[in-house]
Design a protein with these regions (language model features):
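HAD-like aspartate-dependent phosphatase fold
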Residues: 1-16, 20-233
Length: 233
């Protein structure tokens, strides 16, 4: 695909970490790209595997960097996890290892927090991760709770270097229990289908922009989108 064919796409789905920003630093060319999207009436969605922040918090983060983008342009793996449970297990209970972005998304769809006998153990990115939490999760999974992780990223980029991401956090629980987690974020096709639905475009009308071959590019290719790999992450 050449550049003109890419420019002709109606919709653009973009990763965030390593594509739009690195930590709290906006990456070069992003402001111009967003201006081009708006001036050419392109439909666009920032689709992040991170589950830490809500769309409102992501909007505010970009606003602090000088980008004024509506809250409706953000979709996270936390929202994808919540939507999955709302459809597959309405009224379920969960023990959650995660940040407020994940907890609030689950609460909004009626998931009840339960650290005694939950239906699910759900793992997302969080700084509040310790041996006690791992032990609790392991015992709950061994007692029958199903294991879900918000995404399969092993690491994530920051302005200080690489940091452990969700798959690194769920791995000890998998190893100790012998159970494999079900990963919700990219490249899970459920998340990509939701992204296309939110944009209101078909896969052949959209492009995926990301910095990871194992999630962003694979997600785009498997869903029939044109893919763009950037090397900024």
């Amino acid at each position: 695909m050449n550049l003109e064919e890419l420019r002709a796409r109606k919709g653009f789905i973009c990763d965030m970490d390593g594509v739009i920003y690195l930590g709290n630093q906006l990456l070069p060319g992003v402001a111009e790209f967003v201006t081009w999207l708006n001036e050419n009436d392109k439909r666009f969605l920032f689709l992040t595997n991170s589950s830490e922040r809500s769309p409102k918090e992501l909007q505010q983060k970009l606003q602090r960097m000088g980008l004024d983008i509506g809250e409706e342009h953000f979709y996270t793996s936390a929202l994808a996890t919540a939507a999955f449970l709302k459809k597959q297990a309405p009224g379920c209970t969960a023990f959650v290892i995660g940040a407020p972005g994940l907890l609030n998304a689950l609460y909004d769809v009626g998931v009840t927090m339960n650290d005694v006998d939950p239906d699910y153990v759900i793992v997302g990115e969080t700084a509040s991760y310790n041996y006690e939490v791992i032990t609790k999760a392991v015992r709950l999974v061994l007692n029958g709770a199903r294991l879900i992780a918000t995404n399969s990223d092993l690491t994530g980029p920051t302005e200080f270097g690489i940091a452990p991401a969700c798959r690194s956090l769920v791995a000890p629980i998998e190893l100790a229990t012998g159970k494999k987690a079900y990963f919700m974020g990219k490249p899970n096709p459920l998340m990509m289908r939701t992204g296309l639905q939110l944009l209101g475009v078909h896969s052949e009308e959209a492009a995926m922009v990301g910095d990871r071959m194992d999630t962003d590019v694979i997600a785009g290719m498997e869903s029939g989108l044109a893919t763009v790999l950037v090397l900024s992450g």
